[in-house]
Amino acid sequence: MNKQNIQKTLVLLPTSALLAGCLDATDNPANKITPTPNADGKYNIIFITTDQEAYMEQYPAGSNYAARERLRKLGTTFEKHYACANVSTSSRSVIYTGRHITETCMLDNTNYAFVNDMSRDLPTVGDMLRDAGYYTAFKGKWHISEDTESLEEYGFSDWTEGNMYGSVWEGYKEDGTIADHAIDWLKSKGKQLNNDGQSFFLAVNFLNPHDIMYFNETPGTYIAGEATPAPDDPVYKKSYNVPVPASWNESFDKPGRPAAHKEYNKQWQDWVGPSPTDSLGWQTFRDYYFNTIQDEDNHMLVLLKYLEKAGLLNNSIVIYTSDHGEMQGEHGLKGKGGNIYENNIHVPLIIYHPEMKGGRHCYNLTSHLDLAPTFVDIATAGNVQQFSAITQELHGHSLMPAVKNPATDIRNSEGALFCFEMISMIDGDYVMNPSLKPAYRADMNKRGFVRGIITPDYKFARYFAPVKFNTPADYEALWADNDVELLMCGTDETENLAWPKDNNANQQLVELMNQKLNALIQREIGTDDGSETKKGYKGGVEMYDKNKYDQ
């Protein structure tokens, strides 16, 4: 049911019926939970994703994110969880395979003609959990191939929504439908599976807050061919007294700031219109962003209500996260892309388990690479041999030890790896002309690809050209082929501690972080030579290098 139909239906319902369907976010559903594994001795897994939602330590004052608050009370909140790649296609390929983009070869969004579908030979979470005896179903946004009717070749059944990328107002229009389809599936297929003694994995992929991508209130201007102010809906009327990031007007020409940030900003504004030019504009932008989250939260609350009403919180583990973040004006940027700033790659993660106490917090590092092993750990239910057999090619870690004991160190010592290889975002002066062959051309000498590492204390990244993959062994080699960035965690991330190269008091720290990054790449990727670009891009990156053409 889309938003317009919902509004028409509400008019016909009596107020008492509407109130009866509301959840009181102040009650404690944990009091009603009795852990009850299914007849196969396992729990269902209900995996909820949002799109473009950055981590928030505290929700904005005045919001009513009842679904998220409910999950926080019920589950374990992972406070330092990071995406491994941006944007949607890349990150989702990691989530649904447990492999970095160097293996999935999903380097850019599939709606570009130069991007291939993900290989159907690559095992997905759906395939892995089927091997563990689960029925696997998928609802909502996919965006890892151009399929429009079925995901059976990717290990998932019962996908009915078709491929959605997150177009103008698509979250506003379709998130209610996604929730409805998930509930309908649970009432019919899910219930029958459990009655027959089989556990299931259900992925519910919402679209919002992705609608923020196209927000624009400037009269007479258009994005993606449409004027895109906020919808005329009560959910979108609220304003929040939340300060904009102090770095909203940070210069892109600031000494030490990677040039990739300026290129990205030029590219992004060409795609979706100019960014706000003052703090008030960013405040309006963020108000809309918080309201898109509220809109999605309302639909997620309906889903959680059904889980509680149907008793599915007794026999299901619920996991909620987002594919990547949204900059929201931090460092003068909007959107998501190739940088290691907090709003870009720090995302929410909550895991509810019927057997575990709720309201707990894990403050240790975790990563999207860890989700697939977590799913398999749940699905194999203590069968160590089966778990090892299914995950032998994965490099992430199960998060279940941290669900049982939030103090458990998952990857503090080794760090979390971030990879970025989108040719569509590296050149602000790109050429897109359908009459040209190829139609898309960018400067492949610009340093816009990223390898980054997040540790408990620092973030470190090197930005390099698509035609200059490298694994620098020393300080001089590091600077020869890369723009280098070192940020201290817990700060506003406006000081690049790696800059300047010469006579830098932090040189030893930079060298240490480079060594840690190299070690993590070796562990989770192996040889990092860019060979994936020949598979992920039709013809390889050189095909789209405008330096090879007369301009």
Question: What positions do the PLM features span?
Answer:
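Bacterial N-terminal signal peptides that target proteins for export
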Residues: 2-11
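Catalytic-site neighborhoods of secreted/periplasmic enzymes
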Residues: 94-202, 207-228
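Active-site-proximal N-terminal segment of extracellular/periplasmic enzymes that hydrolyze or transfer
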Residues: 28-79, 85-86, 482, 497-505
